[in-house]
Amino acid sequence: MSLTIGGVGEPVQLTASALNGFSGTTNVSLSGLPAGVTASPTTLSLSPGAPQNVTFTAGNSAQAGTASVVFTGISGSLTHTATLALTVAASSGVNVTTYHNDNSRDGWYSSETTLTPQNVNSNGFGKLRELAVDGKVDAQPLYVSSLSVGGQSHNALIVVTEHGSAYAFDPDSGGQLWKVSALGANETTSDDHGCSQITPEIGITDTPVIDRTFGPNGAVFFVAMSKDASSNYHQRLHALDLSTGAELPGSPSEIQATFPGNGYGSSNGNQVFDPGQYAERVGLLLMNGQIYLGWTSHCDEDPYTGWLMGYSENTLKQTSVLNLTPNGPSTPHYGNGEGSIWMAGAGLAGDSQGNIFFLDANGTFDQTLNSSGFPAQGDFGNAFMKVSTTGNQLAAADYFAAYDLQSESDADQDLGSGGAMLLPDLTDANGVTRHLAVGAGKDTNIYLIDRDNMGKFNPSTNNAVHQELPGALSGGAWSMPTFFNDTVYYAGQGDHLKAFPIANALLATSPAAESANSFAYPGSTPSVSSNGSQNGIIWAVENQSGAGVLHAYNPANLGTELYDSNQAADGRDHFTDNKFVTPMIANGKVYVGTTNSVAVFGLLP
């Protein structure tokens, strides 16, 4: 089989064939995986006639080449082997098609051959241009290479705005390839509901997702909010042809939902999705032919609950709905259901098994648990969630909630301000392969979660969690981390950019390095560029009261700042900043959303 670096292969099916009446169980292990390639699962037990699948993933650090992967089956004294010829291929062209580069949300662009620690400095690197647009760019821009537009091949930068517009630019020339409005006839963008979180208008807030294989030319998917002439609000899922910007068949799809529940704001035994009460802030997740959406409120304006929805990529029809707080009663402070999903604009994370991971915000959590350790009423406010998509149906599969979650919710110190990042497979001190995720919110702690056993809820301790780093982020996280060379990088509110190395599947309990500068509210979501494991650069945007600063650091020593956009004379590299901006790197350039453009940084001519 073949794998592309940064990609996931088709499942490999293993079957134990019974001979001479054999009916035992065969324990299968595998060996020979090349560096940077992981398998899930790595061990399994086969019964005759009951096949199981193994999925291979080539991470960003994988190298192109071939390998022989050996499956060894043992049952009693019997041993049998089978060999899989595995080819790891280099990525064909440059594509950044989803938030933070991939569904693990690690923010690692590993194919950068132009930008290096040697040439990123204010003498040779800076702002090349700004691509003007008609509103704020809160979503991360996306990038595709060799896109056919009007019979010509272009690299393309996909940009969406809070004015409800979507653009394609040629990032090399700065020319506009197409522009479309997602607003319906006689509609405007939504007002900001008197809330300063997304202001002064709400159009397209979420980072879209691109599927280059969909339809004749590929497609870009996003959610847009609007308001009609009768002051009714609309949320719609759009699918645009990547080459033309035209709406594809079935697009747009009006978003509506109900879910059984009797909590605050319910009607006749159901929670009903009110499009005016919500914003699609998180980045969209495309996984196994389904597009997943998560919803947040406007400044905690009740009533609202936590909604997760799935839509068919092919039809844009809704396939599944999960409400995270359907039965939350009306209570003081942060009760009333609530439990929204916003994560500072980070994308919902997804693993190779089809599970979704995210953190939800303050809201009702039922501390009365059923026999499986789940909230008896199905209310999961202020939790680190794992949601199964088996059969394209959303269902809570596991979770972690802190022992003091109620007091944290009451004090607005919940987990929901930060995003979840999935780590590559790691081996602990006992040789056990661990599948981990990392997340942090407002409470200043970093949580390292075992995705196979997240820890659930204990009212007196967090000991069931894989690892907790209390107070590691002095001001909390309104952002998410990035990952490079076995190190997690965080930039919390009012804190420095910090490097936490990983050894034996555990984070260092204190940072190995940190930046000299700190990041004011809301902190920063860093990204990383590298050529494989070499020439790494950590990129982060600082908000200085509306004036943005792009920083570049040496990942091996964050105290060594390579560049910042205030260094050049006469404001050459200045730009205005939005609150939750994630830098995107592709093909020798860095892209940063501003209040009315995308700032493009690269090597100066």
Show where each model-derived region lies.
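Long beta-sheet-rich domains in secretory-pathway and surface-associated proteins
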Residues: 1-92
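Mobile, glycine-rich extracellular loop/lid and propeptide segments
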Residues: 92-427, 433-457, 477-500, 523-530, ...
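Long amphipathic alpha-helical scaffold regions
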Residues: 378, 470-475, 518-521
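Inter-blade linker and blade-boundary elements of WD-repeat/beta-propeller domains
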Residues: 458-473, 511-516
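Detector for outer-membrane/organellar transmembrane beta-barrel domains
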Residues: 494, 499, 507-523
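Contiguous ligand/interfacial binding patches
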Residues: 568-569
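C-terminal structured domain segments
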Residues: 572-574
